[in-house]
Curated annotation (Swiss-Prot):
Required for the insertion and/or proper folding and/or complex formation of integral membrane proteins into the membrane. Involved in integration of membrane proteins that insert both dependently and independently of the Sec translocase complex, as well as at least some lipoproteins. Aids folding of multispanning membrane proteins. It comes from the Bacteria. It holds the Pfam family 60KD_IMP. This is Membrane protein insertase YidC. It comes from Pelagibacter ubique (strain HTCC1062). It is a multi-pass membrane protein. Gene3D superfamilies: 2.70.98.90. Belongs to the OXA1/ALB3/YidC family. Type 1 subfamily. The gene is yidC. GO terms for cellular component: plasma membrane. Interacts with the Sec translocase complex via SecD. Specifically interacts with transmembrane segments of nascent integral membrane proteins during membrane integration. It is found in: Cell inner membrane. The chain crosses the membrane at residues 6-26, 326-348, 355-377, 424-444, 469-489, 512-532. NCBIfam families: PRK01318.1-4, yidC_nterm, yidC_oxa1_cterm.
Length: 558
């Protein structure tokens, strides 16, 4: 990559982002209208509240799991249990994912509500009728029949109040991450009652988050085709509420998602809030009347999943969950990022290694931009051939910058050379570069995937460091000194590439460009190793192409 073109292209990209934010922000009238609608929804007294006074003494996770009777569940992807007290899904571990690369300890996502970092899902009914007993977090349910939940064996929970009403939960589990809960009310009394169905995700504490601006971690919903993303700190300041008829409610981590999907075609109110714990929930806005000696049933779906692309896309399609694929944060360049993942995944299946797949994608990108790059290199080759004449003009007009600039422009016009022509191929490639960064950062498929040699995780930084001679000295340098072998390889290839480009006439500019490979080496050191490998091989392929083009031009001129 021509360093000057990289700087120019990045500047142009920044300008586009700034202009977009200036001209496409919602107007104040729209914001005011949305706030008015928000207040109207929040002050709606027709829908019962999910606020409850719950006081639980905090226990260790092990003790909390022993405190109440539980139904165990297991399939090929998850293992855990459902507490009979409250009937919440509050214990779930992913069987296929380790916490760290070389440790066998598995990722545990859900924990009981009386654990410090409790994280759980609950569902059921509430009512505006204060005289009726309804199951809550303290209710102890009874198991009817099978007492272990698997993908082949559903379970049934029941609880009856003293007013002649029985509540049932029929829970099933597929072979991956989907729980289906059929909530049933059987009214054996001589009175009619109204109930509102709900689903709720509760998280006691702020989790450890990545903190990168390119990744959303927090509250997530698609409501009537609108994507809603709210950060934890925003919800701590002000709750979010919106009414919709279609969508899902979720809390999203980098690689995991916990979501509840309301019944189809029924209006519901979604709320994100914080009252000593984070809550994401929905509640139906219209009561369901259960007449005397009758019954009703509502079905909700709960997905607690690792964000594997084929799994998330499969649920989105098979369950008809609108835009559920956005549970993976593909970003605003969705139209590039997601297809790029599929290309990478294709080469992975073909070559058996994501590092090799990245190199294959690099070659494909070079081939796709070959005509643009050729045009750029020919222009730079002409610039290099004009270097002696440019040096002569510089010496001739060294005391008059205006005349020097005019002479240079006349030379460019005469020789039909555009010094900025190299910008276009670089500018086109910048979205691809950021899209690849996004893919490496957010897709669980890249997690703990090795390359050859010392790279054991392409989604993480190069673990080696120049400052301990790549592990030869028994010293662990601080993170800001972790400049690994691949970032250095990238810097060297960029420096060699610079030598193929014409030297800038301005000595200060020349020094800046000479320092740029060192600067970029330091900047890219903490980036995912896969991205640095991409940039390194892109430099190598660019140098080869540039050398061939310039050699042909030299032969033609001699």
């Amino acid at each position: 990559m021509d360093t000057r073109n990289v700087i120019a292209a990045i500047s142009l990209s920044a300008a586009v982002i700034i202009l977009y934010s200036l001209f496409f922000q919602p107007d104040p009238a729209t914001i005011k209208k949305n706030l008015a609608e928000q207040n109207k929804i929040e002050n709606n007294e027709d829908t019962p509240s999910l606020d409850k006074n719950e006081n639980f003494s905090k226990l260790s996770r092990a003790d909390a799991l022993k405190e109440n009777d539980r139904i165990q569940f297991e399939n090929g992807s998850v293992v855990g249990s459902i507490s009979l007290k409250g009937a919440a899904i509050d214990d779930l571990t992913f069987k296929e994912y380790n916490i760290e690369l070389n440790r066998n300890e598995k990722i545990t996502l859900l924990s009981p509500r009386n654990v410090e970092d409790g994280y759980l899902i609950e569902s059921g009914f509430v009512s505006t009728n204060k005289n009726i007993d309804i199951p809550d977090a303290s209710t102890v349910w009874e198991v009817s029949g099978n007492n272990k939940l698997t993908n082949n064996n559903p379970v049934k929970l029941t609880w009856s109040n003293t007013q002649g009403i029985t509540f049932e939960k029929h829970i099933s589990l597929d072979d991956q991450f989907l729980f289906t809960v059929k909530e049933k009310i059987i009214n054996s009394s001589d009175k009619s009652y109204n109930f509102y169905s709900y689903g709720q995700i509760i998280r006691n504490e702020l989790p450890e988050i990545s903190g990168f601006y390119i990744l959303h971690e927090g509250f997530l919903s698609v409501l009537d085709d609108e994507l809603i993303e709210e950060d934890y700190d925003d919800i701590q300041d002000k709750k979010f509420t919106q009414i919709a008829q279609d969508g899902f409610v979720a809390i999203s981590d980098k690689f995991w998602v916990t979501s509840v999907i309301p019944p189809k075609g029924k209006e519901f109110k979604t709320t994100f809030d914080y009252k000593n714990k984070f809550r994401a929930n929905y509640i139906s806005t219209k009561g369901i009347e259960v007449k005397a000696n009758s019954s009703i049933e509502e079905k909700i779906q709960i997905i607690v999943a690792a964000k594997r692309v084929n799994v998330i896309d499969g649920y989105a399609e098979n369950l008809n969950i609108n835009k559920f694929d956005l549970a993976i944060d593909w970003g605003f360049m969705y139209f590039i990022t997601k297809p790029l993942f599929f290309v990478l995944d294709y080469f992975f299946k073909l070559l058996g290694n994501y590092g090799l797949a990245i190199i294959a994608v690099t070659i494909c990108i070079r081939l796709a931009f070959f005509p643009l790059a050729n045009f750029s290199f020919k222009s730079m080759g002409k610039m290099k051939l004009l270097a002696p004449e440019m040096a002569r003009l510089k010496e001739l007009h060294k005391d008059d910058k205006m005349k020097l600039q005019q002479a240079m422009m006349a030379l460019y016009k005469k020789e039909k050379v555009n010094p900025m022509s190299g910008c276009l191929p670089i500018l086109v490639q910048i979205p691809v570069f950021f899209a690849l960064y996004k893919v490496l950062f957010v897709t669980i498929e890249m997690r703990h995937m090795p390359f050859y040699g010392w790279i054991h995780d392409l989604s993480d930084r190069d673990p080696t460091s120049l400052f301990n001679v790549f592990g030869l000295i028994p010293w662990d340098p601080p993170s800001f000194l972790l400049i690994g072998a691949w970032p250095i390889i990238m810097g060297i290839t960029m420096w060699i590439q610079q030598k193929l480009n014409p030297t800038p006439p301005d000595p200060i500019q020349a020094k800046i460009f000479m320092f740029f490979p060192v600067f970029l080496t330091v900047i890219l050191a903490p980036f995912p190793a896969g991205l640095v490998i991409y940039w390194s091989f892109n430099n190598i392929f660019t140098m080869i192409q540039q050398y061939i083009v310039q050699r042909k031009m030299t032969i033609k001129t001699t």
